[in-house]
Amino acid sequence: MADVTSDYECAVIDEIQMLGCKTRGFSFTRALLGIAADELHLCGDAAAVPLIQELLKVTGDDVQVRSYERLLPLVPLEVPLGSFSNIRTGDCIVSFSRKGIYKLKKKIETGGKHLCSVVYGSLPPETRTRQARMFNDASSEFDVLVAGDAIGMGLNLNISRIIFSTMKKFDGLERRDLTLPEVKQIAGRAGRYGSKYPMGEVTCLDAEDLPLLHSSLKSASPTLQQAGIFPSFDFIYMYSRLQQKRGLYQILEDFLENAKLSENYFFANCEEMLKVAAVIDELPLSLQDKYLFCISPVDMDDEISSQGLTQFAENYAKKGLVRLKEIFSPGSLQVPKTHSALKELESIHKVLELYVWLSFRLDELFPDHELASSQKVICSMLIEEFLERLGFQNPTSRKLNSLMAKKRRQYL
């Protein structure tokens, strides 16, 4: 979350069109309205400009709009990839499920010509960065990238061609066609200025998906109508005074149902927050502490992650002090040998990340910040080694074997 308590001479918010996102939009709106900067630069899709101008009328800010053209051309191809034998160095093939990503990686590497880096949302940020660096390195043999939609955010990549393995994704509610902004954001990662390629290309794995790709790239993005917001604790607290003897879950549910918003705003999806509230409502915690746990970075659909949050909250309620060693044994982490073990390690990383997040806000009560941080790093390194080993299922070069040995020594 952006720091809205300090003063800055200049600040930059990238991908500002994300303020219209149903799940993450509130964090961009919060940054836009809350960052105390003499000058604030907003980068992103022009579709967000009218809404931003409308929002900032209220604050009295001076808004200047400067438009820039893409420096390198993006060329939608007329033919699909068709076969994995047509994969080439610099390609990025996109899937929208973790299972799909590893399936594609295996198919490409089975051909024996390429090794694949992978980038997807549930990988630790450190691992995503290292996978991207390995793909960008011309001396690396990992010359193809397989990625989820996380590719569109926060990574600089030397991609020559984007290949959509599908033009549909499951959004948590239904399997639907990709939206126009989603297509543009992902396709636009090919041939970025500063990469070694003179242009970017984009196509699909299957011919049946090409019409949606081409129509999306030709169309202007729809103008954003609303920005996401999220109820702050102050609002929840004031509302709670009218809801005597009710738990946070009921207070939140009633607040979201009855609150009246300006036409320029919508409440971001609070489903995750409500799931946490339902779990911790019975604990003897103050409303403010419950709210803190509710806004913490936890995936309640991940069993290990949700158990971690529950244990942290229970220990905090009973003892007022949460030691990491009570639920986690340092030194027990190992390189995963299966995909299920990899997923478990990703979940453990989420728990460690949650502890670090809580330690920043309740530092004396979550005192093992350094231990959690160091174990988090080890977690991401072990995941990294597993991903590299996946690329060694075929006979490998001495250089790759040497690379693995060097990394293992760093873990010890």
Residue ranges and their predicted role:
Residues 39-49, 139-140, 157-218:
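Conserved segment of the helicase C-terminal RecA-like domain
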Residues 1-5, 138-156:
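Conserved two-lobed SF2 helicase motor
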Residues 41-43, 48-50, 84-112, 116-120, ...:
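Conserved strand-helix element at the start of the C-terminal RecA-like helicase core
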Residues 10, 17-73:
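Post-DEXD/H (motif II) to motif III coupling segment of the RecA-like Helicase ATP-binding lobe
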Residues 23-27, 34, 68-110, 135:
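Conserved interdomain hinge at the start of the Helicase C-terminal
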Residues 14-16, 165-166:
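Walker B catalytic acidic pair
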Residues 231-412:
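Non-catalytic terminal extensions of ATP-dependent helicases
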Residues 103, 117-148:
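Conserved helicase ATPase core of P-loop NTP-dependent helicases/translocases
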